[in-house]
Amino acid sequence: MSLLAAVFLGVLQAATEFLPVSSTAHLLVFGELLGHDLADPRFRAFATIIQTGTTLAVLVYFRTEILSLLAAGLRSLARRRPLETPQSRLAWFIVLGTVPAAVLGKLFEERIEALGNWVIAGSLVVLGLVLLAAERYARHLRTVEDVGARDAVLIGLGQALALVPGSSRSGTTITAGMLLGFTREAAARFSFLLSVPIILGAGGYKLWKTVPVLRGEPSWALATLVGTAVSAVAGYLVIDWLLGWLRTRTTHLFVVWRIAAGVALAILIWQGVLPAGHASVSAPAVEAARAADPDAPLGAALRR
């Protein structure tokens, strides 16, 4: 992968990770259009690892709130009164909202990874329409301080739905928040805070699984490092822009974006430009391929 492509995909990851439009769909489509084999484990490792850049962006942007929530949660735990303050309640509701995605992600990990591009196209369109319904019919009056246990569970289920490729984690959680009556900005802010435990846990696990794929691949390792750094910087800017946008504007832009992207993806699949499905290659398979022929390029070794 060229460094220019890594920079482009890093910016794309940052924009589509936080906007409710699905980073998975955009990375796979543009990765294919840039000439990369979606089944190549190096590309899939790149696509996974650069997500740590956007994770870092969330941690830096919300660092004050995260530290405050962490301190409040620990103090309430020590006092055995978890709901004693608004901050401690929010901290524990974030933990509660993390449970659905953590449990379902572990149970259905392999099935989710096997889902193909038709599912991505369908998710883009269907959830775009749900976002439109949330925009048009829900009351947008509640703030982050109004989050309760029921809200945390329901938005957490929205986060679990984002395990389906093409759904968009920010898209499903922001939509769920809006359907529950939160303002657009409050729904987005809670979405970002809710993402911290799951992206640290799931992201760390995926990082551990995929980093070995890039061993002995210096050009891919460099491209991944550059893409990750770019996604971190761009991600910070995107978060700031999105929160400002949602204070005064609707989500109609993202509804149109999702539906257009879903239709475009369906056309590309139908025309044979993109595959209907994709194969995933595990780290053990990579090690086996390298053991069979240490001198062969990884892509060629895996195809044997």
Swiss-Prot record:
Keywords: Antibiotic resistance, Cell inner membrane, Cell membrane, Cell shape, Cell wall biogenesis/degradation, Hydrolase, Membrane, Peptidoglycan synthesis, Transmembrane, Transmembrane helix. The keyword Cell division does not apply. It comes from the Bacteria. InterPro entries: UppP. It is a multi-pass membrane protein. The chain crosses the membrane at residues 1-21, 54-74, 90-110, 114-134, 192-212, 225-245, 253-273. It is found in: Cell inner membrane. GO terms for molecular function: undecaprenyl-diphosphatase activity. It catalyses: di-trans,octa-cis-undecaprenyl diphosphate + H2O = di-trans,octa-cis-undecaprenyl phosphate + phosphate + H(+). Its EC number is 3.6.1.27. The keyword Chaperone does not apply. Catalyzes the dephosphorylation of undecaprenyl diphosphate (UPP). Confers resistance to bacitracin. Bacitracin is thought to be involved in the inhibition of peptidoglycan synthesis by sequestering undecaprenyl diphosphate, thereby reducing the pool of lipid carrier available. This is Undecaprenyl-diphosphatase. It comes from Anaeromyxobacter sp. (strain Fw109-5). The gene is uppP.
